[in-house]
């Protein structure tokens, strides 16, 4: 109903600013990181280990759970990739993402660039709330994917609107700010 709200919950703090982009305005009401969700649950005295397990309302789209891993978008899109295809580029980590976008040749043969800002992908985002290391989290996601193998639900293709993001190399360097000015801003 009209009182319903859409909340994005994930590891990505960048989603908090994406919430205000003109192409998605009013699509999402609130963004929470996993850390914020855990704090909220704790404040309300909710212990997940005491909650009954339940299934998703709908079957998950095949491979969608791999999305937060490097190569996950490519796999979810149904593209064939063994990691050696020069037209499909998966890149993770700020420096690597910056490097690929600053060095794309004008006549590029790339079909798709999958940039994940966080090293090792979204499973290593700053909003993660897990005691497991990134490699254990990766293994858990892959095992979960394999546990639902055979579920070949493929999403419908929607003509309504295809959102496309483009990148234009544009360096903007502002004036240098001194320590005194920084302290003044923080006070």
Name each model-derived stretch.
Residues 1-184:
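Iron-sulfur-associated redox domains of electron-transfer enzymes in respiratory
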């Amino acid at each position: 109903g009209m009182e319903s709200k859409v909340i994005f919950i994930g590891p990505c703090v960048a989603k908090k600013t994406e919430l205000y982009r003109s192409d998605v305005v009013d699509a999402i009401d609130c963004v929470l990181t996993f850390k914020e969700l855990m704090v909220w649950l704790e404040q309300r005295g909710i212990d997940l280990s005491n909650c009954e397990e339940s299934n998703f309302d709908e079957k998950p789209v095949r491979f969608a759970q791999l999305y937060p891993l490097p190569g996950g978008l490519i796999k979810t899109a149904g593209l064939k990739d063994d990691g050696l295809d020069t037209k499909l580029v998966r890149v993770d980590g700020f420096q690597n993402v910056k490097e690929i976008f600053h060095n794309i040749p004008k006549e590029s043969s790339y079909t798709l660039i999958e940039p994940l800002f966080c090293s090792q992908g979204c499973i290593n985002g700053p909003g993660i709330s897990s005691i497991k290391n990134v490699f254990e989290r990766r293994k858990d996601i892959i095992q979960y994917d394999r546990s639902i193998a055979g579920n070949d639900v493929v999403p419908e293709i929607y003509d309504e609107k295809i959102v496309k993001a483009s990148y234009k190399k544009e360096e903007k360097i502002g004036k240098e700010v001194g320590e005194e000015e920084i302290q003044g801003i923080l006070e």
